[in-house]
Amino acid sequence: YTYKSDKKVTFWFGKEGDAIFPLQTLYNNQAGYENIELLEDSVLYELSVDKLHDLYLADIHIANWGRKFAERECIKSEQLFISRQFKTSLERYQDLIADYPDILQRVPLGIISSYLGISQVSLSRIRAKIR
């Protein structure tokens, strides 16, 4: 998430096995703008950008993994942009449930509504409508 006018704005969810790289840091060597909040007990492994770049140079398989990771992140960013511009809040909710079937059991509704770009009241209405 990041902050807009002192309010948390969620723009990404991760799950087991996902890699977390602030792309601003990885590619521009600048501090990222995002904050990471773990909602469940987790184990994290840290790898410096310099070490990752060394691994890219040392192993083509790791370099290809990094390229594919970046490609997936670009696609996710584009999908989020398209979703926010052209889909209704109901469609965005349905997409989220399709992508993360157990999200309602794992993430507070306030965070989900932030991700969808709607109020928690609007989210409650959507959920009531499709029950």
Where are these regions (language model features)?
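Phosphate-/nucleic-acid-contacting segments
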Residues: 87-131
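Cytochrome P450 core scaffold surrounding the K-helix E-X-X-R motif
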Residues: 1-7
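Generic anion/oxyanion-binding catalytic loop in active/binding sites
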Residues: 3, 41, 82, 101
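Short, well-structured alpha-helical segments
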Residues: 67, 71, 91-94
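Cyclic-nucleotide recognition modules
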Residues: 9-68
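Short, Lys/Arg-enriched, Trp-marked, Pro/Gly-tolerant hinge/linker segments that flank
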Residues: 77-88
